[in-house]
């Protein structure tokens, strides 16, 4: 069933809004994957805050105009599934990477992060990016480390003095 002009405009507006708010995107060829597996992929994506869209490439190219994913338009060919990360940089890549381990028919074509388009070989690396909470945790640990070391150093001096005095006392009592 062909889409009417109004339906096409609605699809373009919807994808454009998602793309404008997304942190990263993954385009993967889904040819040969059954409906049940695609439904499972959509469920996994929803749980991770990833939006999946299957749209015609011409509509996707129009939707990407003026967004950071505009550079993907030139390389989009074939039936593509678009996954958009809405919560952190690597969530879409994680969902697609994990799903493609078990389903070889899902073949990654493009990965876009921050307006830069990467090939499929970068999917695993992008999927290993920390989540927002993990990044904050790493940052806080890094900021906390110098203070912790300073406190440990400051506590070491009085502790050493107490041990020295105790050793002198034990030596005098033994003599």
UniProtKB/Swiss-Prot annotation:
Spans traversing the lipid bilayer:
none
One GO term of the cellular component aspect? ribosome
Q: Which gene encodes it?
A: rplJ
What family does the entry list?
Answer: Belongs to the universal ribosomal protein uL10 family.
The signal peptide here is none
- Assembly with partners or alone: Part of the ribosomal stalk of the 50S ribosomal subunit. The N-terminus interacts with L11 and the large rRNA to form the base of the stalk. The C-terminus forms an elongated spine to which L12 dimers bind in a sequential fashion forming a multimeric L10(L12)X complex.
Tell me what organism the protein belongs to: Psychrobacter arcticus (strain DSM 17307 / VKM B-2377 / 273-4)
Alphabetized PANTHER family for the sequence:
39S RIBOSOMAL PROTEIN L10, MITOCHONDRIAL (PTHR11560)
Q: Could you tell me what this protein does?
A: Forms part of the ribosomal stalk, playing a central role in the interaction of the ribosome with GTP-bound translation factors.
The protein's UniProt keywords, in alphabetical order, are: Ribonucleoprotein, Ribosomal protein, RNA-binding, rRNA-binding
The record's Gene Ontology biological-process terms are: translation
The UniProt entry, under Gene3D superfamilies, shows: 3.30.70.1730, 6.10.250.2350
Q: Which NCBIfam families match?
A: PRK00099.1-1 (NF000955)
Q: What's this protein's name?
A: Large ribosomal subunit protein uL10
* Superkingdom of the source species: Bacteria
The entry lists its GO molecular-function terms as: large ribosomal subunit rRNA binding
Keyword set includes RNA-binding: yes
Q: Which InterPro entries match?
A: Ribosomal_uL10, Ribosomal_uL10-like_sf, Ribosomal_uL10_bac, Ribosomal_uL10_bac_type
């Amino acid at each position: 069933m062909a889409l009417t002009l109004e339906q096409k405009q609605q699809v373009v507006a919807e994808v454009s809004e998602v793309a404008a708010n997304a942190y990263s995107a993954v385009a993967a060829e889904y040819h040969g994957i059954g409906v049940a597996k695609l439904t499972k992929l959509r469920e996994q994506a929803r749980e991770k805050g990833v939006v999946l869209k299957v749209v015609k490439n011409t509509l996707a190219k129009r939707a990407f105009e003026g967004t950071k994913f505009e550079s993907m338009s030139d390389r989009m060919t074939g039936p593509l599934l678009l996954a958009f990360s809405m919560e952190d940089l690597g969530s879409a890549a994680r969902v697609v990477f994990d799903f493609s381990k078990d389903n070889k028919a899902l073949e990654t074509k493009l990965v876009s992060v921050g307006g830069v388009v990467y090939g499929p070989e970068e999917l695993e690396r992008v999927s290993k990016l920390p989540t927002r909470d993990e990044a904050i945790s790493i940052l806080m640990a890094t900021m906390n480390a110098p203070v912790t070391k300073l406190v440990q150093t400051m506590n070491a001096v009085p502790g050493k003095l107490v041990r020295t005095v105790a050793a002198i006392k034990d030596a005098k009592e033994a003599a």
